[in-house]
Structures are given as structure tokens and as C-alpha cells.
Amino acid sequence: MSKRQTGMTLIELMIVVVVLGIIIAIGVPSYRGYIIRANRVDGTSALLRLAANQERFYMQNNIYASNAQLAAALPAGLGIAATDHGYYNLTIAAAGAGLAVGYTATATAVAGESQGSDADCWTYTINEMGLRTAATQGAADNTGVCWQ
């Protein structure tokens, strides 16, 4: 009479470990890319909100708000201290002829945060005309990809 052995062999266990390693090696970068693309909304939505608040500010004051008025509560400012999740820094620059004529608002990814590794959509901009642009970390235009 022979005894039947039950359980797993070392080879079977190693095969399972290798398969899990392959799944993790493929899955983690894909998930990371998904999170980066999803977090881009933090910058774009903040800029669109800022642009709407700029128009409201302009209607009341006949001049666009400056960078110093970014965080001040309405109606003295725009009421936007930062993006909702803090992945982007917001700044406002006057147009060539000054804030009475126009502005350019910029959202730049915060280094060290999750968006700090987003090389494809590092900065977003919008101006008083609604013109949207986006650039990579190397300052190459990537508007078509980033403002989808």
C-alpha cells in the first residue's frame, strides 16, 4: 500500500510566485498611469473655476484679479487658494498691457506630490479669451492630450 502525498511542491509554489510577480509588474505601472491621468482634472477644473471667477471679478471691478488676490474671498478676490487636492500650484500673470486687458492663469504640478511625476501634462494655462494650452516638463506643447 502506498501513501498518497498531499500539498504543494516547491516548484508549484515558485510558479505561483513568478505568475504573481508578472501580474504585479504589469498592473502597478498601469494603475499609476491611470491615477496620474485622473488627477489631471484637479488642475483643469481649478483653472476653469478661476477663469469664471476672473470674469465675475472683472464685471465688478473693471480689471482682472492679480496673483495677490487669488486666495482672497469674493468679491475682493477670486476665492481660490489652491486646487481641490493640492496637486497643482495656481498663479496669475498680467497680459502684456496689464490686468485691465487680460491675464494668463497657470496650474503647475507640485513636485513631490502624485502629479509631480506627470511629465506629459506638467503645466496648464488659460487666458481671458479662454485659450487653453498645456506643456510637458520639457515645455513642449501637449495641449491636445492634456485638455481632453
Regions found by a protein language model. Give the residues of each.
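Outer-envelope exported proteins of Gram-negative bacteria
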Residues: 46-49, 108
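Periplasmic/extracellular, small/polar-rich flexible segments of pilin-like filament-forming proteins
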Residues: 59-148
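Conserved catalytic core of two-component sensor histidine kinases
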Residues: 17, 44, 51
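Residues at secondary-structure transition points
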Residues: 5, 37-41, 45, 98, ...
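N-terminal single-pass transmembrane signal-anchor helix
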Residues: 2-34
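Alpha-helix exit/C-cap motif
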Residues: 37-41, 49-69
